[in-house]
Structure formats: structure tokens, C-alpha cells
């Protein structure tokens, strides 16, 4: 079994790249960072596993060494590759996506909590979520607020998946929550009241959405004068329910962020023109949070 002692990170990287090209599981020994302050940390090994789209197995400790195992993720086991005849149910209850809980990922949870605090969610009476799916965002809001604060809100969730909406209704049978099956491109047909806060996580970049016109429509027609908006931009992929940093692009085998950053910059500039104060944060999901007073 390979033993790493004083190799450089580049040497380790090259070894992993070569070996993982021909095997799905790779084990090796390395210095124990608990006993050797110069050894690579467990976080560094976890980062390397993610780079090579592997899952880091729990290391085995053997005195001054640890045994590390990388297990390749099955990249075909991803909702991104799902072949579904009914496009409205790509994210429905029978989809791979439906089993994902973004709120259980530490960086997503941390970034979303910060965005909700910036938006002062407790004071936003009318809240609209576009692409609500099974209502994970409403679940977090409910957990963050007191029962009295949550009961004062009027929350509306919209999704084109009928099965997801039916599931969300069962999870939130509260009188202050409404769930609607609708194509977001046809939002005007619902004649909704203007909102204090709009949230959309990973929906605005869908191929079926005309992003820039829809964003302008939301600001001009669906937000109140003193309002807030939270947009979540995926900078990652889900493989086997594991969140892997970096969104895949069609023509490259690495993450190319040009389109993502272009969308964020457009939103930032447009919202600033409309006198919103804008913040950008996050990692695997980049959050744009804006509010206007």
C-alpha cells in the first residue's frame, strides 16, 4: 500500500489522478495530522476526494499513520442526467432530486441562514418562493422563527411539479401557506399580490427560464417598494446525494464559471439601479441577497 510521508501536494495530486483513472476504490497510508503538525489535514484529504469526485471513507488510525480510502462516486447517479419524459416532473417525488436535502449541507445552510437574516425574513409578511419543490426553504424559515413570528407570515410556493406541490401541501397544512402548480414563466396569470420577499434557489438558471426578463419582471411587477430578494445560484453538482463543488459545463471537463458570474453580475447591477443594497455570499451555492428600504 502506498505510503505518503514528505511528498508535495503536487506529487500526491499526480498520484491520485493516475491511480483513480483505472480504479474505483483507492486506499493508501499518510501521516496522522493529530501527531504530525506538518501532515495534510483531514479537510485537505476531503478536498482532494471532492476534486476527483470521490467519497472519503472514514480514515482508519494506526498510530502515527492513517489509512485513507477514496471511493469514486457514480456520476451517472445524478438527477442532472435523469431521462424523464414529463419535464414538469424532473424534480417530482419520484426523481433523484427529490431525495436531496440542501439544508443538510453545512455551507448551504450557513449561507442561506445569513441571506435570510440580511433580508430580515421575520419582518417580511408576504413571501413568495419560486421553485419551492418540497418546501425545504419554508421548513428552514419555520425552524428559525418563533411560532408567533411564523404565523404572521403569508407564504406562497410555486413549482411546475404537481407531485412536489402535493407533497409540500401535506408538509405545511398551515393556514398561512399556499402552494400552486404553475409554470414560473406564466407568473402573471396568477395575479398574486406584491411581495415583501421573493426567494428562488437554483430555479432561475433552468434552461426553460428566460432569466434576465424574468428577473426584471419580478422586481418591477411582483415586489413592493420596500422589499427583498434572495437568489441562489448553483455552483455545484449533486452526485449520489453528495454535493460536489463546481457546476459542470457541456464543453469542458472542469467547472467554468463565466455564465454563472455573468448572471450574478447582471442581477447585482440591475438591483443596484433599482436602489437595492446587494450582498453576494456562499460557496457551493452563491447567494445574492438584496433589500430596499
Language model regions located:
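N-terminal accessory interaction module
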Residues: 1-86
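Conserved Class I S-adenosyl-L-methionine
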Residues: 242-268
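Conserved SAM-binding loop of SAM-dependent methyltransferases across substrates and taxa
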Residues: 134-150
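Conserved SAM/SAH-binding beta-strand->alpha-helix loop
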Residues: 161-162
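Class I SAM-dependent methyltransferase Rossmann-like catalytic core
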Residues: 59-122
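Conserved beta-strand signature within the Rossmann-like core of class I S-adenosyl-L-methionine
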Residues: 226-235
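A short, conserved alpha-helix within the catalytic core of class I
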Residues: 206-218
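A short acidic, Gly/Pro-enriched loop at the edge of an enzyme's catalytic core
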Residues: 189-198
Amino acid at each position: 500500500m502506498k505510503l505518503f510521508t514528505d511528498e508535495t501536494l503536487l506529487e500526491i495530486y499526480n498520484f491520485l489522478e493516475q491511480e483513480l483513472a483505472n480504479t474505483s476504490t483507492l486506499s493508501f497510508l499518510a501521516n496522522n495530522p493529530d501527531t504530525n503538525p506538518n501532515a495534510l489535514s483531514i479537510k485537505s484529504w476531503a478536498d482532494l476526494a471532492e476534486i476527483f469526485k470521490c467519497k472519503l471513507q472514514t480514515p482508519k488510525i494506526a498510530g502515527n499513520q492513517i489509512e485513507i480510502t477514496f471511493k469514486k462516486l457514480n456520476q451517472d447517479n445524478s438527477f442532472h442526467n435523469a431521462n424523464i419524459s414529463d419535464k414538469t416532473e424532473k424534480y417530482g417525488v419520484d426523481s433523484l432530486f427529490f431525495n436531496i436535502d440542501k439544508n443538510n449541507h453545512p455551507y448551504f445552510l450557513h449561507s442561506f441562514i445569513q441571506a435570510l437574516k440580511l433580508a430580515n425574513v421575520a419582518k417580511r409578511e408576504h413571501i413568495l418562493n419560486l421553485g419551492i419543490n418540497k418546501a425545504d426553504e419554508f421548513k428552514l424559515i419555520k425552524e428559525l422563527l418563533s411560532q408567533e413570528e411564523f404565523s404572521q407570515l403569508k407564504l406562497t410556493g410555486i413549482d411546475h411539479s404537481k407531485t412536489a406541490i402535493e407533497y409540500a401541501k401535506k408538509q405545511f397544512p398551515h393556514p398561512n401557506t399556499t402552494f400552486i402548480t404553475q409554470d414560473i414563466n406564466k407568473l402573471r396569470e396568477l395575479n398574486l399580490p406584491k411581495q415583501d420577499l421573493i426567494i428562488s434557489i437554483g430555479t432561475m438558471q433552468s434552461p426553460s427560464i428566460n432569466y434576465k426578463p424574468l428577473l426584471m419582471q419580478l422586481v418591477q411587477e411582483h415586489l413592493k417598494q420596500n422589499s427583498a430578494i434572495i437568489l441562489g445560484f448553483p455552483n455545484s453538482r449533486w452526485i449520489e446525494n453528495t454535493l460536489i463543488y463546481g457546476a459542470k459545463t457541456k464543453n469542458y471537463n472542469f467547472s467554468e464559471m463565466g455564465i454563472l458570474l455573468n448572471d450574478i453580475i447582471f442581477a447585482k447591477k440591475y438591483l443596484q439601479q433599482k436602489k437595492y443594497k446587494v450582498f453576494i455570499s456562499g460557496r457551493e451555492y452563491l447567494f445574492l441577497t438584496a433589500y430596499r428600504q
